[in-house]
Amino acid sequence: EKYCPNAKVVYDQFHLISNFGRMVINAIRIRLSNQCEENGNKDAASLFKGSRSLLLTRNSRLPDNRRTKLDDILKFYTDLNKANELKELLSEIFQSTSKEEAQKLWSAWYKLASESDVKEITKFAETQNENYKDGITNAGIYHIGTSVLEGINNEIKVIKRVAFGFRDFDYFFLRIMDAFRGKPAFA
């Protein structure tokens, strides 16, 4: 806040979709697999084996043979089908061209997620809406991923390592600013 008072928090698509996949889709997959095994339905439980990457991959990137297997899973399990649809809709927020459009898409996504009656989805939606909504909708203005930021952080670590530490933070900050002089600003 002191050095970058106008900075806006922006969450990138990769990490949000990754969290959705881990906290929602994978949790539902494991829950359904365990239910099938408890009910003695080994064939249905085996359908979930090796399906993790299949469920986490964007539908548009799946080849036809894998898309058929995904359709077979989604046809029988409505919770996974809802999660898959919401995963695809969540990605659309990051394609928006303005904050207003991103907010509209977020509101629609949040409404669908809240009304899904799937505990994993509603919990994720509540957490994101309470804590991260502004960072997600800011993606409509600032189309930046963490790859650029990770590169900047790496360069900062190099400055710190070469200097063998700084005793004065203000001087360290000046060295960082000097390293990026003339490079385009992202915020």
Model-found features: residue ranges?
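Acidic/histidine-rich catalytic cores and adjacent linkers
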Residues: 1-8, 14-17, 37-187
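Short alpha-helix plus adjacent loop in nuclease-associated cores
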Residues: 16-37
